[in-house]
Amino acid sequence: MFRASKALGQRFASTNVPVKTARPFRNFLWKLGAATTVFYVGGVALSTYNYQFAELFTDNVPLAEELVQLVESYNDGTLNAPQLSLDEIRKKFGSITRKVQSVPHLGSTSSTVTESQSIASGSGSTAAAATTGTDSNSVVLSSVPPVGSVLLRLPHLKLDDDSNSFNNKSFVESFNKQVDSLNEKEFILPENAVESFLESYHGLSSQLNELNRDLADQLNSQLGQLSAELKQSVESDKVKEIESNKLQLMQQFEKDLSNLKVEFEQKFDSQLQSSLKANEQAMLAKHKNELAMLSIKQVQEFNKIISNKIENERNGRLKNLDELNGSVKTVSDSLAALEETLLRSECVNQLTNLVSSIKFKLNLDNTPSLDISKDLQKLTTLVNILPGKPNKCDAKEPQLIDVVVNELNSLTSAKENKQILSNEQLLNRWGLLQDKIREASLLPPNAGFLGHVSAKFFSLFLFNKSGISNENDIDSVISRVTENIKLNRLDKAVEDVVQLQGWSRLEADDWLQAARSKLELETLVDVVDHEIKTL
């Protein structure tokens, strides 16, 4: 049919001047189809040899799985296409050929070739007509169609919904494109030829639908048979696999059971041995405990007998032993009280003598610097051993004598206070400071070099005073401090020096610290003396 259509199209086209037109869209479709075909053919071919590529190809490419299964079934010989005999093919397509051959030829007016000859000759007559038209260039189309002729319009080929698969769709689309190309050429044929051609065309559509249905039925029957055979083979394989697994499981179960039995026997034997050993140790320990309790009871009975013997002897020959013990305790308490009284009296006497000695040393005038560290150590020892004081751990507040002794030790512990100045030394140092104090009293505030020179010069004209004066000028203060030191009234002297201001106070600062140290020491010694007198 396609050959006849092609020959007929060439006959009709021989009357026209051939014009080559570019069809980029059609070329693109052909290239796309060729590339797609090569891609699918290469993918299917490689999938038959590489299992990993087959999984990747069938999972990501549409229709790849169906094509791979089709090729595998073809290689295995399980695909059986419907076998049609030559008579059946002639019976289905012979009528179409006869109807196409009966179509008359409507070409140029100069052509003398008959319709039957052109169809029978095929491509040869078409080539001759094309050559004639090309060489002579005198072919002229008939401007007026003959009477009884109609325009050839072929409808699109349509298949049933049951036969509408992907391959059939591609074939139908390609065929319909050819039909559209024929319709675009607008062939004019006799009415009876058009009717016979359309009848053959519709017969072709029905024959294709019938062929697709037969092919689908045969494929379904073969698929059902193959699925049944596959199911039967799978079931037989499963039965064999189940039997083998059952046998393996039974063997494994028997093996595990025997191992478990041996393990339980070993565990039971070990537990039995451990329990027997524990019971043996418990029995031995119980036996030892009973022996120990028996020996303890025997010792208790023996002690009881001894205590009874002693009580009997005490009530007999040692009857007055308790009275003697009470008398001895009374005598010992009296002796302890007497010893405490004597010790307290001795400590008080020693403390009194020691304090008197310290006072005597402090009041001496013609002695060098005083060192009373040894006297203070002895004083601390006597205070610590003095009886009658409460215990330091039980007392809530410390005793006054303890606090005073600690202050004395801290006062003399500093390096500069280990040597205490006597009254004679304080008087001599004060005499050396008198000229500096007078000179400093004449200095103006913020005095410079000229101020110091002027103060030095004018201090030569000052008169020295003596005795005790109640005035507050610098000469009266100096004479009053001197007299207080001579009369052993150090507290009054310190009070007058403290009231000095400016450079005079700064010049007398060292002397004031030494005097204060001695004054504090005398005050603490007086407190210790008064505290001793209260004991």
UniProtKB/Swiss-Prot annotation:
Component of the mitochondrial contact site and cristae organizing system (MICOS) complex. It is found in: Mitochondrion inner membrane. Residues 106-136 are annotated as: Disordered. Residues 191-342 form a coiled coil. GO terms for biological process: cristae formation. It holds the Pfam family Mitofilin. It is a single-pass membrane protein. Residues 1-12 form a transit peptide. The lineage of its organism: Eukaryota, Fungi, Dikarya, Ascomycota, Saccharomycotina. Residues 50-535 are mitochondrial intermembrane. Residues 120-136 have a biased composition (Low complexity). Component of the MICOS complex, a large protein complex of the mitochondrial inner membrane that plays crucial roles in the maintenance of crista junctions, inner membrane architecture, and formation of contact sites to the outer membrane. Plays a role in keeping cristae membranes connected to the inner boundary membrane. Also promotes protein import via the mitochondrial intermembrane space assembly (MIA) pathway. Residues 13-26 are mitochondrial matrix. InterPro entries: MIC60. Residues 107-119 have a biased composition (Polar residues). This is MICOS complex subunit MIC60. Belongs to the MICOS complex subunit Mic60 family. One of its GO terms (cellular component) is MICOS complex. Keywords: Coiled coil, Membrane, Mitochondrion, Mitochondrion inner membrane, Transit peptide, Transmembrane, Transmembrane helix. The chain crosses the membrane at residues 27-49.
